[in-house]
């Protein structure tokens, strides 16, 4: 708001101008609305699909909230999540288990006022845009958008094992895991922000079943000293052998806007700062063996 006095004559004039009072009356009492939606679909023993949605418009608030406490943004989000057992597509005798999980979530927040000119509502700024490109650019700056996706296969395995005495080469000893997480964000100060994480792992675990070697068990002497000796034995194989190999990769990329030049109007809406990024790759390996060599049988 600007107040002033203009002299339309050619003569120079002097005077005093007093502004005694500036008052705002009648708050903008327009209300808003909100809605939630949920959907759950069960696909027999194959899995399930869940969908949720939520929307909150500007001006929404609780009954006890004042005008200043009400939201000034339009916010919308939806999410779809599915969990499936892909092993159901294989014959039962194959004993295949492939638990699959996938989800996608999208959020969008649109402010009421133009972030480049907070005295103007966003819809008025879009209407005043001179071209479609300028309109799209203003909308991309004003709105904050977040997209997240998750995909994973956890402990996929083929449960075929040798009966009674599991062998080290049985397919049931192996399991495989893979996951990918992705997030992409755009907003007022961020042209885009990207986060990615990949993980792959292979696990092996073998627990042999065997009878311990007890060389003195057959002694029939009733001496208590020999009785103690009879309870000793030797486990000639470990109780469990396991190893794990895991590879992870993380990637991060951030492209920020040059807000100083953007707010001053000395550059276009596509002005940006230097790109920031980071990347990490890890390969972790773990081996474990559980072996109680000596066996002692407690008296019954």
Label the predicted regions.
Residues 11-14, 61-68, 109-121, 128, ...:
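Outer-membrane beta-barrel translocator domains and adjoining extracellular loop/strand segments
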Residues 296-300:
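Conserved small/polar residues in nucleotide/adenosyl-binding loops
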Residues 1-12:
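Extracellular beta-strand ligand-recognition surfaces/modules
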Residues 45-46, 84-101, 110-115, 154-174, ...:
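Short loop/turn motifs that connect adjacent beta-strands in outer-membrane beta-barrel proteins
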Residues 33-37, 76-82, 147-153, 198-204, ...:
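Hydrophobic, lipid-facing positions within transmembrane beta-strands of outer-membrane proteins
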């Amino acid at each position: 708001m600007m107040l002033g006095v203009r002299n339309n004559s050619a003569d120079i004039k002097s005077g005093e101008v007093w502004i005694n009072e500036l008052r705002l009356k009648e708050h903008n009492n327009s209300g808003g609305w909100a809605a939630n939606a949920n959907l759950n679909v069960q696909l027999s023993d194959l899995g399930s699909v869940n969908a949720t949605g939520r929307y909150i418009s500007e001006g929404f608030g609780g009954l006890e909230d004042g005008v200043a406490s009400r939201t000034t943004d339009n916010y919308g989000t939806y999410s779809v999540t599915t969990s499936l057992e892909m092993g159901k597509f294989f014959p039962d005798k194959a004993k295949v288990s492939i638990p699959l999980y996938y989800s996608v979530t999208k959020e969008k927040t649109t402010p009421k006022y133009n972030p480049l000119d907070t005295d103007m509502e966003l819809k008025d700024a879009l209407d005043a845009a001179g071209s479609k490109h300028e309109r799209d650019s203003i909308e991309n700056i004003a709105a904050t958008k977040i997209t997240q996706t998750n995909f994973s296969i956890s402990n996929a395995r083929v449960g075929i094992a040798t009966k009674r005495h599991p062998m080290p080469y049985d397919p049931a000893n192996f399991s495989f895991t893979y996951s990918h997480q992705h997030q992409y964000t755009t907003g007022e100060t961020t042209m885009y922000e990207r986060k990615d994480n990949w993980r792959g792992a292979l696990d092996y675990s073998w627990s042999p079943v065997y009878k311990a070697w007890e060389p003195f068990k057959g002694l029939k002497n009733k001496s208590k000293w020999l009785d103690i000796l009879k309870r000793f034995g030797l486990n000639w194989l470990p109780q469990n052998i396991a190893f794990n190999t895991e590879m992870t990769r993380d990637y991060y990329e951030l492209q920020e806007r040059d807000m100083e030049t953007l707010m001053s109007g000395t550059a276009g809406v596509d002005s940006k700062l230097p790109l920031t990024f980071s990347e990490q790759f890890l390969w972790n390996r773990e081996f474990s063996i559980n072996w109680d060599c000596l066996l002692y049988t407690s008296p019954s």
